[in-house]
Amino acid sequence: MEITTIDTKSKLKLNKEIFAYTYNEGLVHQAVVTFMNNARSGNSAQKTRSEVSGGGKKPWNQKGTGRARAGTIRSPLWRSGGVTFASKKRDYSQKLNKKMYKRALRSIISELCRTGNLMVVSDFQCDNHKTKDFLKKMNQMEISNALIIMSEVGENEYLGSRNLIDYDICDVTTIDPVSLLRFEKVVVTEAAIKKIEEQLQ
């Protein structure tokens, strides 16, 4: 299996086991859900009426005042009262076996290859850290929305792209299913292709 680099027009051999893998939609969905759940902090928390400080004494007599009956000043109906269905800290993390995660990444990369959304460049380097020059480089390649995968991310490439919503840049070790699916195109350097093959073998 071969792919043509978009800059030098040279042919690059690809490993069929990684770049022509059968697409498994269920596994990809599981990997995406697991990744997104593992990114959740789960720190949202409120206090119920029993946890809020104070409210032990009945504010006024049950009868005789003409006011509505009340048993505590920490009722959810009151200002400074507890929350009726208070959320609690929760661990959302899920486990996904390494083999399953690798197969999911193979499925996504292979599907990108089949649909023509995986593009290979011989090398990707920026002369400086200016966002303007980074955009100019991407416009020359006619790519308006992409994830760029490099073997190692240089400082110029990182600084030039970090303020742009339509582009993201990462190295091979930090590839994740959500980023691969989020962008229209995935641009990979030749050096990164070799590392991907080693990593997903």
Curated annotation (Swiss-Prot):
SUPFAM superfamilies given in the database record: Ribosomal protein L4
Species: Legionella pneumophila (strain Paris)
Pfam families listed in its UniProt record: Ribosomal_L4
One annotated GO molecular function: rRNA binding
InterPro entries in the record: Ribosomal_uL4 (IPR002136), Ribosomal_uL4-like (IPR013005), Ribosomal_uL4_dom_sf (IPR023574)
PANTHER family given in the database record: 50S RIBOSOMAL PROTEIN L4 (PTHR10746), LARGE RIBOSOMAL SUBUNIT PROTEIN UL4M (PTHR10746:SF6)
Gene Ontology cellular-component terms listed: ribonucleoprotein complex; ribosome
Keywords, comma-separated and alphabetical: Ribonucleoprotein, Ribosomal protein, RNA-binding, rRNA-binding
GO annotation terms (biological process): translation
This protein's record includes keyword Signal: no
Family stated for the protein in its record: Belongs to the universal ribosomal protein uL4 family.
Protein known as: Large ribosomal subunit protein uL4
Function comment: One of the primary rRNA binding proteins, this protein initially binds near the 5'-end of the 23S rRNA. It is important during the early stages of 50S assembly. It makes multiple contacts with different domains of the 23S rRNA in the assembled 50S subunit and ribosome.
Region entry Disordered, spans: 42-67
Assembly, per entry: Part of the 50S ribosomal subunit.
Domain of life, source organism: Bacteria
